[in-house]
């Protein structure tokens, strides 16, 4: 039998968002297991960076990843390709954002690095008015946003 490769997008295809909480539906997990049991391979093909492909996604049984809109490719745990933005370009963007008081984050294989005010701002957007709304406060206290939990705040963004 001929082996096939099945490519899944992440957002809205493999991963669902129910009430702001990302998860892989059981039906998708079963489909991946069945596909792999037939000897086929399962790859992710997504615009997400490596750092945004959380463990709960990979635990479904993924054979490879085409991430960052094609800027990152791995088979198993072996990186085959990684297209980086130059340090000069990163520094230019960071300087512009900081000078103009933009909140932002920088994606890399090693993490999602947030500007100093971004996490607080995103918590308000994702969780709601947690200071005045009891439901928003309960959600805020759970800290159940994979994205917010992945953000690393307070690191130097400029690169040499």
Where are the model-predicted features located?
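Asp-based phosphoryl-transfer active-site loop
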Residues: 4-20, 44, 93
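Intrinsically disordered, proline/serine/threonine/tyrosine-rich low-complexity regions
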Residues: 154-155
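Short, structured loop/turn "capping" segments at alpha-beta junctions
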Residues: 103-105, 138-139, 158
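Short loop/turn microsegments at loop-to-beta-strand junctions
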Residues: 2-4, 61
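Active-site phosphate-binding/coordination module
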Residues: 28-131
